[in-house]
């Protein structure tokens, strides 16, 4: 295919309050669109209409996973299927379950809702009660970006540390970069007292092409998905992820705008090429938007890259000027010791990389559990808002590794539940380990879509982890 056949787009976007009006012209055809809000479902509808009118790719959100017809449904037990408080808006994503002498406590992501991190309680894992929020509206730490549809609060997790409860979490800073915070309380329901500053703030990058200005929200990236693991001897470890998977799409779009000949080198399908051309054109407008709007505008380009993952990385790896893009496509899991007062001590180590094809441009959501004398890390991979998102597992003989991955996901999308991810492990009522995780209802996905809480039993040996994948057939996954 000759490059001149990839006709360019002309785009005129205009902000209209919370809505966006976009006029798109290509090859003599003009269409006008209105995106009513910054929510992901409205952007997904826009991209579907764009695909209908201009032949770009349809968004993966809403596309059913590929599942063989005779594949039995897994033995995943739904625990929470509705918001248990009118102030909880998107369910219970990134669920962290802690078993205490007073039953089970759950904390979960709240995204950009005014009240950060719902706290739930259950005695039997069946009936759950909303017990408040870690940071109710107006009480979030001063170092975080705050306000309705402004702040972002993700992936909280409680741990019992001595006589206190600690909560590590992710919050967006006023610069737009994500950071990890630490709060402490005498009880899982609080009151929670933040330490007053980020515990970790790193890997923030200016990708907005708007110039460096510390007073402006131009940064992307940062750190996310923190997890505290306490070993049998009382040693404390903090795990987290370098969050650069949202960093590379707009620089890639900028590179394609500057060097349009790369589009045909990266993509073979016409729909993907047109998608890349559109992303290249809308890029400057995307730079002016809030982080999750940027993400939504670039989502189809990201999906085109993931569908051509190995080839795209190979081409970009040999392309001058793409070094930062390629580096940002790696989202390593880090780990470091924690002192008794919550300070980071010792060496920061990378313990896991997204180096398997199914993981695509990211791994995240680490959770370590000690079973059968070994350390098992559960993690999520691929795009959280699509059915490609899955749960993987790796094993090591020390909390800091080296970890050996299994080659295939432990849990992946089914006909009944899409995008299982960000798991935690806690003893069930029988004392045996259970995996707790979130998933979307079929046909749903993306930022602020409802995520349900599910669970499934786990069985460990020295060399394998077994989940009751089907109601009557255990599936054993042996480590490579």
Model-inferred region functions:
Residues 2-480:
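Carbohydrate-active catalytic/glycan-binding domains of CAZyme proteins
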């Amino acid at each position: 295919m000759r490059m001149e056949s990839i006709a360019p787009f002309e785009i005129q976007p205009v902000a209209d309050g919370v809505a966006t009006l976009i006029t798109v012209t290509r090859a003599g055809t003009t269409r006008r669109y209105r995106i009513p809000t910054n929510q992901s479902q409205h952007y997904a509808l826009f991209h579907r209409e764009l695909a209908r009118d201009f032949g770009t790719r349809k968004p993966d959100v809403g596309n059913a996973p590929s599942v063989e017809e005779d594949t039995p449904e897994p033995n995943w037990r739904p625990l929470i299927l509705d918001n248990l408080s009118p102030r909880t808006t998107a369910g219970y994503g990134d669920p962290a379950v802690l078993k205490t002498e007073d039953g089970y406590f759950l904390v979960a992501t709240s995204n950009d809702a005014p009240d950060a991190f719902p706290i739930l309680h259950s005695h039997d894992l069946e009936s759950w009660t909303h017990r408040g929020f870690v940071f109710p509206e107006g009480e979030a730490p001063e170092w975080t970006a705050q306000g309705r549809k402004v702040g972002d609060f993700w992936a909280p997790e409680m741990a019992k540390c001595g006589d206190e409860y600690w909560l590590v979490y992710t919050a967006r800073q006023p610069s737009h970069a994500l950071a990890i915070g630490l709060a402490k309380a005498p009880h899982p329901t609080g009151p929670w007292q933040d330490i007053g500053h980020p515990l970790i703030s790193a890997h923030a990058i200016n990708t907005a092409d708007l110039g460096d200005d510390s007073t402006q929200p131009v940064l992307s990236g940062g750190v996310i998905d923190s997890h505290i693991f306490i070993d049998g001897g009382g040693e404390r470890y903090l795990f987290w992820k370098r969050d650069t998977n949202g960093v590379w799409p707009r620089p890639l779009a900028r590179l394609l705008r500057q060097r349009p000949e790369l589009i045909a080198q990266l993509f073979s399908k016409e729909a993907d090429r047109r998608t890349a051309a559109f992303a290249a054109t809308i890029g400057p407008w995307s730079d002016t938007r809030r982080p999750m709007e940027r993400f939504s505008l670039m989502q189809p380009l990201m999906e085109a890259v993931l569908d051509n993952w190995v080839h795209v990385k190979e081409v970009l790896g040999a392309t001058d000027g793409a070094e930062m893009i390629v580096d940002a496509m790696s989202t390593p899991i880090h780990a470091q010791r924690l002192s008794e007062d919550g300070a980071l001590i010792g060496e920061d180590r990378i313990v896991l990389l997204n180096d398997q094809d199914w993981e695509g441009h990211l791994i995240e959501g680490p959770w370590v559990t000690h079973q059968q004398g070994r350390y098992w890390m559960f993690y999520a991979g691929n795009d959280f808002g699509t059915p490609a998102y899955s749960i993987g597992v790796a094993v090591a003989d020390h909390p800091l590794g080296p970890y050996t991955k299994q080659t295939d996901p432990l849990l992946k999308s089914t006909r009944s539940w899409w995008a299982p991810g960000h798991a935690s492990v806690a003893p069930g009522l029988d004392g045996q380990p259970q995996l707790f995780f979130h998933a979307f209802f079929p046909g749903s996905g993306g930022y602020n879509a409802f995520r349900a809480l599910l669970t499934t039993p786990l069985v460990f040996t020295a060399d394998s982890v077994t989940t009751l994948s089907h109601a009557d057939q255990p599936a054993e996954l042996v480590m490579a």
